[in-house]
Amino acid sequence: MRWEELEDALEVLETEREYDGYFCSIKDAVIIVILGSLCDLQSVKKIHAWATTAHVKTFLSETFGIKRIPCYWWLLSLLALVTPESLNQCMKQWVASLVPQLAAKLEKEEEEQSKKKNKKQPLTIAIDGKEIRSTGKMKKYDSPLHIVSAHIGELGLTLAQKTVESKSNEIPAVPKLIKALEISGCMVVTDALNCQRETAKAIVEAQADYLLSAKGNQKELMNDIEQYVQDEKLRATMDSVSRTEKGHGRIESRSAYTSGDVGWHPGGREWPALKCIGAVHTRFETSKGVTDEWHYYISSKVLTAEETASPCKNGMVGRIDALAFGCAL
């Protein structure tokens, strides 16, 4: 990995007020936090302990010229000076520079598998919102803030993130986030909250495809798909795949169904480029009993049951690293 690209991206960092860089620059502090986050360290305290180990100090010195590691409280103070918007822009720029390299590597690794399928699989972009719990106690906010993120499932990278002041504000924020990204040719997956016509429209206009989860907030849509899927004769005509997994004291059975037969649906004209409906049935068997769940989906692409099952099972929802961002708040 070329670390120069990270340093270049951080050149546009902005701060709430001026700082002379005495002892440790803000850029160095952010680099330490980013690298610690990549090592799956989930608090600034753990990152500081990691950064002060001998081999990490040597790496930081030789790679980035960071000669001094600030104490834990000083590291927090430096991060608090960073504006969230500029940090988000820096991360978007850095991740964008990495995507072509990682995508090429992924394509090479899956070359044999792709040959068998005779088609190239698109990258999956997951749109998801997470609550920043610590912000609920801050006087300037009536409720905890939320981060809406766009995550590349196959590469384990977050493309971009946007803060909103409540969960309901995620809905108008998602189309804006999508319009700011280059996602042409990708498959965009969202949770039920963001199964919205405006979101679907933004995805299609970005020349991408969507796979949206239909639940209670789109009750009529969910009920229509449910009636179709639960009709045994109609379900028998759908493409399907089933698998069973055992482990951790439970048996999980999963079945996926898809159909390109959407002409009957009255909302076909309302949902942009609607071409497919799908369902995933999950059954869990444990010592405590048996539970089962049905989840319903719509897509702008005619998908096989296998294609539907994969992103739905894995969720494709990546962890947003909010350490530096949360401190900046």
Name the predicted role of every residue range.
Residues 11, 55-56, 205, 289-294, ...:
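Short acidic (Asp/Glu) and glycine-rich catalytic loops that position anionic groups and cofactors
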Residues 140-186:
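Electropositive, glycine- and tryptophan-enriched low-complexity nucleic-acid-binding patches
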Residues 1-126, 135, 149-161, 175:
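Dynamic "connector" segments at or just before major functional cores
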Residues 165, 171, 175-216:
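Domain-level cores of phosphate- or acyl-group-handling catalytic modules
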